[in-house]
């Protein structure tokens, strides 16, 4: 009987028995390997190619079986560059899926997709490892408690609050601030949260990965003097990696997070930047595996691949995984199959708008497009819910009036509409906020605003108590008291 690696426990490597095959064909990152009759590896088994290239350099490439082709051939995807591989090279079947180190030994370290440390800080204790392919927790193991996760970011906490143990997506095109927002969330939550975090860098810029590492060392989330006291494990498979690595690095990060949840019974934060690159890597590999492309050229297995990752990110009775994922939106088109498939799995969506970014309003979160299943009076309370709805109504009315203002000017509006526009512009500016991680760029110190303070501030604007203050007083401030103080300063400067 053959064990299915997706449901089996941690398998034991069988390198001693050495089930050997050899390379028959290489197409970019995809290899065809021939094995002796009756010795075919299972799907998802890890294969290792060891040898020397034509100039005598040592080669060590790990691949993952994706398809059984018949005639004793399997098709596998390489997790690192296939440069130097030649036909006829020997391939060893490890007899198990890729396994990565898990547990306390991973904290404060940077890993690649194979679970190998890449931070030059020496080897990692690999006594506890776990396979990256597992089935999702059973339905009866899931936890259904509803509670809010406070982030300290006004626009998020008020209009699209995050669920503790839920899945959150940050949607935006290129350059509207997804990574900065994720770094601010790491700064605010990972520090206040006290639990452990796992960061999966999937197909993003290496520079950003480096910046994040340096920032975490500065803020103490990674403790350089005593690595074991660090609060985060980092797993990177960046833009320069082959598609096999980018396709699996999310699973490596998730496997580490699952261990903290299931074995250590902790509440874990899982950051993934960027989930779109996971889909993109699958799409790159799909055609080479001989699959017919589906909508917009994506892989036909898009929703299955996404589901197998997302369904494992969940809260059980042992502990919770709260996942925050950045989602790149190609050409700002939210109907593209990649972001559209991601939407289905999320509890809250934070949509970033290029229009707001162009106005200089950061975080550029669209108050009308962003949604959350948590924004219900029974969960957040009547006061919060009413305030959020009024803010949305005012913003919506302002959006409707913009065409009239552009053609006829403000003077043609009724008194009531003019007041709505003035308040909406104040709300728009008050939704901006200085970030801790952006202090170097903006020069203004970051602000954390509690939920009660946020609700109070917007209630004051909506009630009309602050109608006399200039709108620039609300731009890039923390709570409402800072806005009134800024207004007094502006008044003093103008005299």
UniProtKB/Swiss-Prot annotation:
EC number: 7.1.2.2
Keyword Membrane annotated: yes
Subunit structure, interactors included: F-type ATPases have 2 components, CF(1) - the catalytic core - and CF(0) - the membrane proton channel. CF(1) has five subunits: alpha(3), beta(3), gamma(1), delta(1), epsilon(1). CF(0) has four main subunits: a(1), b(1), b'(1) and c(9-12).
HAMAP family (alphabetical): ATP_synth_beta_bact
Full protein name: ATP synthase subunit beta, chloroplastic
Residues annotated as binding ATP: 172-179
EC main group: translocase
GO biological process terms on file: proton motive force-driven mitochondrial ATP synthesis
GO molecular function: ATP binding; ATP hydrolysis activity; proton-transporting ATP synthase activity, rotational mechanism
GO cellular component, one term: proton-transporting ATP synthase complex
Domain of life: Eukaryota
UniProt membrane topology term: Peripheral membrane protein
Entry's family note: Belongs to the ATPase alpha/beta chains family.
SMART domains cross-referenced by the UniProt entry: AAA
Reported function: Produces ATP from ADP in the presence of a proton gradient across the membrane. The catalytic sites are hosted primarily by the beta subunits.
Catalytic activity: ATP + H2O + 4 H(+)(in) = ADP + phosphate + 5 H(+)(out)
Keywords: ATP synthesis, ATP-binding, CF(1), Chloroplast, Hydrogen ion transport, Ion transport, Membrane, Nucleotide-binding, Plastid, Thylakoid, Translocase, Transport
Localization (cell): Plastid, Chloroplast thylakoid membrane
Organism: Beaucarnea recurvata (Elephant-foot tree)
Predominant subcellular localization, coarse grouping: plastid
């Amino acid at each position: 009987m053959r064990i299915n690696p997706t449901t089996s426990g941690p398998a034991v490597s069988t390198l001693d028995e050495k089930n050997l095959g050899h390379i028959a064909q290489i197409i970019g990152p995809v290899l065809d390997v021939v094995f002796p009759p009756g010795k075919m590896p299972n799907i998802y088994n890890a294969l290792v190619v060891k040898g020397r290239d034509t100039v005598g350099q040592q080669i060590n490439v790990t691949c993952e079986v994706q398809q059984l082709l018949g005639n004793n051939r399997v098709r596998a995807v390489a997790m690192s560059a296939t440069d130097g591989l030649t036909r006829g090279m020997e391939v060893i079947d490890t007899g198990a899926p890729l396994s990565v180190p898990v547990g306390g030994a991973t904290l404060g370290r940077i890993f690649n997709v194979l679970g190998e440390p890449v931070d030059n800080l020496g080897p990692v204790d690999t006594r506890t490892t776990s396979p990256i392919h597992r089935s999702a927790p059973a339905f009866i193991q899931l936890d259904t408690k509803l509670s809010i996760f406070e982030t300290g970011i006004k626009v998020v906490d008020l209009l699209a609050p995050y669920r503790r143990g839920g899945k959150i997506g940050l949607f935006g095109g290129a350059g509207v601030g997804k990574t900065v927002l994720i770094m601010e969330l790491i700064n605010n939550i990972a520090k206040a949260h006290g639990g452990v975090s796992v960061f999966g860098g999937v197909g993003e810029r290496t520079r950003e990965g480096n910046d994040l590492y340096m920032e975490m060392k500065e803020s103490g989330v990674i403790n350089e003097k005593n690595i074991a006291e660090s609060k985060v494990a980092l797993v990177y498979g960046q833009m320069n990696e082959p598609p096999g690595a980018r396709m699996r690095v999310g699973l490596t990060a998730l496997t580490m997070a699952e261990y903290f949840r299931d074995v250590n019974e902790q509440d874990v934060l899982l950051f993934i930047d960027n989930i779109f690159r996971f889909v993109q890597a699958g799409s790159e590999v799909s055609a080479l595996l001989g699959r017919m492309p589906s909508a917009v050229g994506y892989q036909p297995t898009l929703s299955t691949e996404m589901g197998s990752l997302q369904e494992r990110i969940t809260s059980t009775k042992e502990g919770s995984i709260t996942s925050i994922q950045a989602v790149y939106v190609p050409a700002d088109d939210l109907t593209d199959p990649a972001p559209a498939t991601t939407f289905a799995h999320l509890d809250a969506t934070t949509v970033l708008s290029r229009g707001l970014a162009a106005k200089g309003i950061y975080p550029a979160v669209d108050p009308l497009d962003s949604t959350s299943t948590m924004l219900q009076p029974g969960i957040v309370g009547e006061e919060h819910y009413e305030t959020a709805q009024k803010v949305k109504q005012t913003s919506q009315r302002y959006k409707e009036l913009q065409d009239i203002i552009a053609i006829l000017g403000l003077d043609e509006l009724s008194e009531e509409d003019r007041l709505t526009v003035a308040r909406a512009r104040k709300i728009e500016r008050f939704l901006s906020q200085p970030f801790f991680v952006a202090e170097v760029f903006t020069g203004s110190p970051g602000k954390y605003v509690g939920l009660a303070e946020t609700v109070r501030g917007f209630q004051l604007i909506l009630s009309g108590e602050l109608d006399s203050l200039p709108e620039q007083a609300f731009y890039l401030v923390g709570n409402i008291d800072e806005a009134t103080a800024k207004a007094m300063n502006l008044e003093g400067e103008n005299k």
